[in-house]
């Protein structure tokens, strides 16, 4: 069931035409971005980022400009902002960032975390990706392979934070891509932190993401422990669906970001949950550049 659902969603994603992003002067773009430091309250007062000196934050408008004008995505994708390292130019080859979003789809129960069979889940995800390659080719995209876990899923039950990373390979590519994911479970939804980088940066990203999780937290009243079973909605999916890449199949949602790396561009693709609501905002590029890291 999960495999068929994933395959169907992959076909949906690939069937949507996407726009080309406008090119921008890198120096002018970088100078115009309004980086922030210190303690940041995210839009909607849903969560905070207590940034150390080696990280900076871009508010939603500037994050959107970096994603579109700097990294080659069509404009219009809504985020809560981005976290970027202070010492690295985000427009350079070494540049990377963490896209922050929030999914208010209900309180995710973590009862299954201790009993999850992640090897079986990986196999299902690999099979789903392989089945989607026929449609990828049909739409003009290169076939993709989910190589395996770059970091096996693990759940911090005390802090309600889920971590995992996937290694992805695009046919003909010399470098594999890294999709590093963190989900912070909250009262009514999930804070999504997706790192955009290359597989050769796995050691750095793994260390840096430990810091990112340490300074990211929900505000009072929105934390996991604040859940009220009498008044709050429970999500119709659990830990496995978060890792597989989507919300409950019965809801028809996919709701995840796929972090991608192009040769010199970083591209974000939204999942079918957002596609159902705003199908024209799918992120990706088909002919102008080589799509290298997309589930």
Model-found features: residue ranges?
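Positively charged n-region of N-terminal signal peptides that target proteins for export
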Residues: 1-4
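Bacterial N-terminal signal peptides
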Residues: 7-17
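Intrinsically disordered, low-complexity linkers and terminal tails enriched in Pro/Gly
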Residues: 16, 20-26, 292
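Conserved polar/disulfide-associated segments of primarily extracytoplasmic proteins
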Residues: 22-48, 61-178, 185, 199, ...
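Extracytoplasmic/secreted envelope proteins and their assembly/folding machinery
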Residues: 52, 122, 126, 206-213
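Short conserved aromatic/hydrophobic patches within beta-strands of well-structured domains
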Residues: 53-59, 215-217
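Extracytoplasmic/lumenal ectodomains and periplasmic regions of secretory and membrane proteins
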Residues: 167-235
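C-terminal single-pass membrane-anchor helix
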Residues: 235-295
